[in-house]
């Protein structure tokens, strides 16, 4: 039997044509074969088989199956699961085990999802290539010599390689969407506050959102519907009503759809192949009845400058808790309290994390706060107003997910600024807090994936996923059906 999505698998599970345990064992066998790709940091082999057997028994005994009954999922290793390792791909947390479940984990578990393991990532979610992991880089399933994107590179690669059906990631400035584009899968960042952050290890608290990676928009809609909603444990979670996302996805039509195309997203710095693929797909949609509307979003390049001021400032504050005193790595060479703090952080954090802590401390320091941090917050408000105005005239804003295709491992590590520019098209949606996603639309001249980036207005996730469903090319040439 062939199952390319949970939308296809679920009815077969409920009909008894295939069991949860059979499905889980297939995925676990694949994970074992792909061990050299460094995609998973932890695999819950025994727990997943036991969980699958329990769900099969529940169905046989007439129990009511949950909305995600038997869905094999992977979890990014910065999301807490009670009793499971929680490393954030950092030496600082190596060996640490979480003592509670994140809200999203509890909600998914209650709807009968099955967790296969925890995926690799950039350390503390800081990076765009998955090369910053203390446990080594993840290989892109399309070309092992290339990066999968980051920071949720392990989650994106797991979905692309068929090592899970759906994965959770986190997105601060593009960390779900950019690797989704590099790995030919759908990657959704919801509206800020749509999903509880309780149990997500903080990088930049006013930006961080848990996101979904999947092969289909409908699978993402289903998982989003389970996770979304207010949470008393997270004061920033929204009480905005949770829609029936699956119905909204089905109700979107291409005919009459107004697609805003910013000229700033198609400048001379864009890879020609990426531009060609994205524009060709937009033209195909125009021929199907959509309207392409030229829009302008001036000073778009200022978004990434403001973003790196704000997120490094927040990271500097959030990561102050890792001091070697309460949990995590403690230097063996410390001789007093002060040296314990300094040496534990020096040895426990990787180069990129230390770089961002130093930048954040600088922009928050006396004499520079107004010049950098306050100014960046003002720029953030300007972008919120510009995007709100643009989306009052169009249904969706479309452009490339990344300015270039997946690049070689090690190709950009010597130039942090060039690496930061990998997020130039994804950062604006994070600055404004609007929902955005990457959807596969084709391949470049080297047969590498190209993603299209879509942004909708606040809390329009159903509409966004419905538009993506029309834009998406057929299932990835790589995806191994079950």
Swiss-Prot record:
Superkingdom per UniProt: Bacteria
Main enzyme class: ligase
Keywords: ATP-binding, Ligase, Nucleotide-binding, Protein biosynthesis
Pfam families named among the record's database cross-references: Amidase
GO cellular component: glutamyl-tRNA(Gln) amidotransferase complex
GO molecular function, one term: ATP binding
Disulphide bridges, residue numbers: none
Classification via Gene3D superfamilies: Amidase signature (AS) domain
GO terms under biological process: translation
Reactions the enzyme catalyzes: L-glutamyl-tRNA(Gln) + L-glutamine + ATP + H2O = L-glutaminyl-tRNA(Gln) + L-glutamate + ADP + phosphate + H(+)
Enzyme Commission number(s): 6.3.5.7
Active site, UniProt feature: 76 (charge relay system), 151 (charge relay system), 175 (acyl-ester intermediate)
Complex and partners: Heterotrimer of A, B and C subunits.
Record-stated family: Belongs to the amidase family. GatA subfamily.
Described purpose of this protein according to its UniProt entry: Allows the formation of correctly charged Gln-tRNA(Gln) through the transamidation of misacylated Glu-tRNA(Gln) in organisms which lack glutaminyl-tRNA synthetase. The reaction takes place in the presence of glutamine and ATP through an activated gamma-phospho-Glu-tRNA(Gln).
Name of the protein in question: Glutamyl-tRNA(Gln) amidotransferase subunit A
Gene name as annotated: gatA
